[in-house]
Amino acid sequence: MSPRALKVLEPAATDPALIRNFCIIAHIDHGKSTLADRMLQITGVVAERDMRAQYLDRMDIERERGITIKSQAVRMPWGFDGDFYALNMIDTPGHVDFTYEVSRSLAACEGAILLVDAAQGIEAQTLANLYLALENDLTVIPVLNKIDLPAADPDKYAAELAGLIGGKPGDVLRVSGKTGVGVDDLLDRVVQEIPAPVGAADAPARAMIFDSVYDSYRGVVTYVRMMDGRLGPRERIQMMSTRATHEILEIGVSSPEPTASKGLAVGEVGYLITGVKDVRQSKVGDTVTSAAKPAVDPLPGYTEPKPMVFSGLYPIDGSDYPELREALDKLKLSDAALVYEPETSVALGFGFRCGFLGLLHLEIITERLSREFGLDLITTAPSVIYEVTTEDRNVITVTNPSEYPAGKIERVEEPIVKAAILAPKDYVGVIMELCQSRRGTFLGMEYLGEDRVEIRYTMPLGEIVFDFFDNLKSSTAGYASLDYEPAGEQEADLVKVDILLQGEQVDAFSAIVHREKAYAYGTMMAGRLRELIPRQQFEVPIQAAIGARIIARENIRAIRKDVLAKCYGGDITRKRKLLEKQKEGKKRMKMVGRVEVPQEAFIAALSGEVGKKGKK
């Protein structure tokens, strides 16, 4: 602990001029949680013996994957030039799925530390978050992290960073989150450069929610940044988007463990607990005001998080359905962006259709379901929202291939995204080829420094949600990084491909694909199922169809008994009679026989774990 962090300012009595609100923005794995750890240690808010790596990442998944999913806010004391300041650090998620959370966290700050790995340089997410910070008019402090690494090249990347945000390479701070080198200077720079918060102390209270976390003992803990006025304990508050009123049971600051205080005043960042049990009651981005003297206008920038990717979740054991419902209800308490509704599938039984912010969100939810609740699940291939207009001008929103209308269709619209890919210049050709193959439209490219390129495309979201990211990583030796943002909708020539087993449709394998790729999807799925479904006593045709037109077919050969084994030599007519009789029997079986698709075949076919991984 530094001796400069001895005097702690009292919340609610702090002059706004002595407050600094800042966040750290960086690409995944550039070390922002480690830098946050060092700051907590140097300012003494976490004792040496309590310290653990990634102190602010509370979930096991966050610590294992090394990613931050939920924002955290910490108040730290720091002395500079004889004055003592209160620094509020807001730790933000770095992943593209959580861009809305990041934008709200940025709106709660006046400055941002732009952290870049000195061995890796600028990546896609760094740029995306930098643009968000500049949109919010934040003061940006450029910092190179991990300078203790043998592979670090601080001079090269300092020049790159200075070129990106304007300024001299000498202005770029060099720190090491691991060893703590340069962190004191960084805290000084925060005090010097980041402006103090501005707000009207005597106006009606307005606070912006930038995160809310569910605590199993105390209900929802809402993290807020006070913009105007003040709030105190036992005061009645109102949420401006839902008009719901609650009583504040406890209000305080987290440093980093929650510490109750007499209230929060202008510019301060803290938490409030109202005893509400559902996170949807305190929405990220909403404005909190006093119920007795409410503010007139809410703070700008609030939007409802919209799910982008849909997937079906089914328990492998049908009797786990009530547990799955309960688990989703519990996750919903801490994750307001998750939406789900029950659905049934002929093949997979009862389950839920869930909407997610993106693929990482989907992965994290399924991992938490299996880890925290011990559920074994099948997830169907992810799909996006399509707007289908039928011939009689009805517009149908399709989130699941089984909802796709039969009959004549006038047009189909699909969501598109603007994708930015950053990679070394040697991989430009490979990346462009990959994007073109996914129906991408080239927007432009820029060189950032001598050897890094940013390539911009608009692409259908449906093409990204499958295995685009895996292919991008494997074709660029892991160097490329991707960032995307929604960019509206476009009309597309899409069709629904059904898979028929012995003439009967299996709904779990249906998919909405582009007409050009329908044949490839049909042959791949039919071939995959031929390998997975066990042979029956009779021949089973597997067909892929668009409407009534069959586009691909595979046969599973029948298992046949050797009926001629008992004939030693003898007349050909005798043998023929036995073979004809067998043929008749197989024909009869085929009329009445049903094909059971084993559970393993479903899981393998949907996850693509047969031979070479194809497009799902």
Curated annotation (Swiss-Prot):
One BP annotation, GO: positive regulation of translation
Positions of the tr-type G domain: 17-198
Cross-referenced SUPFAM superfamilies: EF-G C-terminal domain-like, P-loop containing nucleoside triphosphate hydrolases, Translation proteins
UniProt GO cellular component terms: plasma membrane
EC annotation from Swiss-Prot or TrEMBL: 3.6.5.n1
Top-level class of the enzyme under EC nomenclature: hydrolase
Catalysis: reaction(s): GTP + H2O = GDP + phosphate + H(+)
Pfam families named in the record: EFG_C, GTP_EFTU, LepA_C
Places the protein is found: Cell membrane
InterPro entries: EF-4, EFG_III/V, EFG_V-like, G_TR_CS, LepA_C_sf, LepA_CTD, LepA_IV, P-loop_NTPase
Lipid bilayer topology: Peripheral membrane protein
A GO MF label: ribosome binding
Binding sites annotated in the UniProt record for GTP: 29-34, 145-148
Keywords: Cell membrane, GTP-binding, Hydrolase, Membrane, Nucleotide-binding, Protein biosynthesis
UniProt similarity note: Belongs to the TRAFAC class translation factor GTPase superfamily. Classic translation factor GTPase family. LepA subfamily.
Cited function: Required for accurate and efficient protein synthesis under certain stress conditions. May act as a fidelity factor of the translation reaction, by catalyzing a one-codon backward translocation of tRNAs on improperly translocated ribosomes. Back-translocation proceeds from a post-translocation (POST) complex to a pre-translocation (PRE) complex, thus giving elongation factor G a second chance to translocate the tRNAs correctly. Binds to ribosomes in a GTP-dependent manner.
NCBIfam families on file: lepA, small_GTP
This protein's name: Elongation factor 4
